[in-house]
């Protein structure tokens, strides 16, 4: 199994939204800059200095539950995963805060050029252990639910996935808060 973080976004937006329910301004400092120098080149730059007060509020809301921690739905990670079909079948359990952008196609790979019954036969006989590569995105809120529900799973792929989650920025503070024993 291979897991590669492609992009992380939404931290600034989450900070901007954090105190809206309280009719207050964020206490953190954040910047976003996007430049397009020509038709094929884009540079984006994002930075955030999360204030202690905002971090305390984030942790408090996350510990209170998903309905209070809405802003962490906006922090999104795009990831490239190469794993067996059986892992992706289980991963589909997580629909809220998880989407598939694209995946390797068995139609254009092992079943290329086939059609009709021949195609159906080859696809129906694919072993569950065949590895495919997919690009998905997950919200931090979804990743927190995965940690809670899969940290002790029998499949080793889930342990690798949880270990990858630990590598994300602010994972300890925004995903594992209240679950610190699972972070070690």
How would you label these PLM feature ranges?
Residues 1-184:
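Family-specific signature for flavin-dependent thymidylate synthase
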């Amino acid at each position: 199994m291979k897991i590669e973080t492609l992009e992380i976004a939404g931290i600034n937006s989450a900070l901007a939204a954090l105190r809206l329910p309280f009719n207050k301004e964020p206490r953190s400092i954040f910047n976003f800059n996007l430049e397009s120098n020509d038709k094929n080149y884009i540079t984006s730059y994002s930075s955030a200095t999360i204030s202690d007060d905002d971090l305390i509020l984030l942790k408090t809301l996350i510990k209170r539950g998903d309905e209070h921690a809405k802003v962490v739905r906006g922090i999104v990670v795009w990831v490239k995963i190469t794993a067996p079909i059986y892992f992706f079948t289980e991963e589909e359990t997580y629909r809220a805060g998880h989407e598939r952008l694209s995946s390797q196609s068995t139609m254009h790979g092992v079943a290329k050029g086939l059609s009709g019954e021949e195609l159906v036969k080859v696809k129906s006989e694919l072993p569950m252990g065949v590895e495919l590569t997919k690009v998905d995105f997950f919200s931090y809120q979804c990743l927190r639910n995965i940690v809670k529900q899969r940290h002790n799973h029998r499949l080793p792929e889930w342990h690798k996935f949880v270990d990858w989650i630990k590598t994300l920025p602010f994972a300890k503070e925004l995903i594992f808060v209240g679950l610190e024993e699972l972070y070690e």
